[in-house]
């Protein structure tokens, strides 16, 4: 090619790339096969992009032949080449795509990759698989020509602090007429990847369902296709095995685990489309990154369009797979994707199918569903807050730890309601252990009432919506009034129903006088049987747990709580009989004890300590 400056230009890697390359160059990961899977996946993406852009610009397909991927092993020197005749890259795209990682969550990814015993799965999840090639190569040379461009460029690196980029030599430019050629100079311990049978093994395991032909070009003999090159989702379920689905999942999702759920069907009628979706069995590292998109790919008549179409609601963002429409136009713009009524109908129908399949799995295979719930239950519960239309189904799908055990459903809860019980009770907190010892459970426990123990951060939000299940409203034990009067205590707790001997009005008045505006109210508790006091929120505001969470995020100050006291408790009974100073100390102690039990610090820890010491010394 002709150029005025053919000298290579050296450029440094972005800091995150340099750190990632250092991990790859000195990799101890056992799954080195990932490098070939990732390079083939990138080549397939480039062919997809070419096919998509050629819809509007057919001339892009004029040079370079039919779309395919070629793998060339050469033992003299020890090089392995992966070549595609896809869209290709220009100089700036080579720099941007191979010299930087323009993704949110990069630091989190690198931290997890450093800590992982085997990071191969993380590499695929984050979409930086090109760099995995440095696990097997000590030098990589990439030559690329964008479709219909007069110029080809060569990028090269030995995995150090930077890379070189230069116009391609005449020989390289003549060889790469469209697309990208990646040449790996293999390390000595990676020589096995030069063997045709080893290449076929890796392609068969990870890339068999790539839609484009993958050709193995041996040093001796004729090139031959080594993958099936079929859109698996277009085939009948009866033709496919569990192994077929496993391979398709790993190829589509860039994963190493097995799918916990597979949903494959074809919709016919007003709109026709094929669906192949998977629920992973392990949680991806970036599940809660704010910028994380869904991972479902949209195809139109087997042409890849985008993976940014929000084909499922955000609370199903862990689902991976493909939706292939027969009816959508191929030239969909991003704006059209957002406003296309046909796509909205597909989204609604597929979302319903996914939730239905999860329900069915929960009934038929609790163990498989348990893997999904353990990994993604926290995300699914976001939908209870976000998706009013499907709220009841998501509540039915949810599994809870309760005072009766783990993995309980609301259906089971309602079936086990106590005599005269009309509400579903729950308590939100930081940990199961702390919730189990929370004094607000005492009166419920005395009656054998089951209580949901909620510890995920999202629980404080979805429970703030007005909810019911099976006609039974959900009720927080940390908010508003609780009346267990119509529900009898168990035989061993009969004494809990005995009336207190303490003068309620006098005691409440004394505590209110001592606490002043530190609380919004003081009242006798229906929640407590053994503890002296607890704090609750008013009936109309948010739950105490949500108030604390919002306050910690500077999204509003927590309102003043209500102090509930157990009139049967000796400390509470002592307030009305004590002198003014002791009554004040006892009242403040009741408040501060309740704060500690709620996971809060007393307003003045030093004063709390001094007050406690005074009361103890007086009792000696």
Curated annotation (Swiss-Prot):
A Pfam short name: HATPase_c_3
CDD domains: HATPase_Hsp90-like (cd16927)
Gene Ontology terms for molecular function: ATP binding; ATP hydrolysis activity; ATP-dependent protein folding chaperone; unfolded protein binding
GO cellular component: cytoplasm
SMART domains the UniProt entry points to: HATPase_c (SM00387)
Keywords of the record: ATP-binding, Chaperone, Cytoplasm, Nucleotide-binding, Stress response
Region (A): 1-334
InterPro entries found in the cross-reference section: HATPase_C_sf, HSP90_C, Hsp90_fam, Hsp90_N, Ribosomal_Su5_D2-typ_SF
C as annotated region, ranges: 549-620
Top-level taxon: Bacteria
Subcellular location(s) per record: Cytoplasm
Main location: cytoplasm
Family to which this protein belongs: Belongs to the heat shock protein 90 family.
Function summary: Molecular chaperone. Has ATPase activity.
Subunit (UniProt): Homodimer.
NCBIfam families hit by this protein: PRK05218.1
Protein name stated in the entry: Chaperone protein HtpG
Source taxonomy: Bacteria, Pseudomonadati, Pseudomonadota, Alphaproteobacteria, Hyphomicrobiales
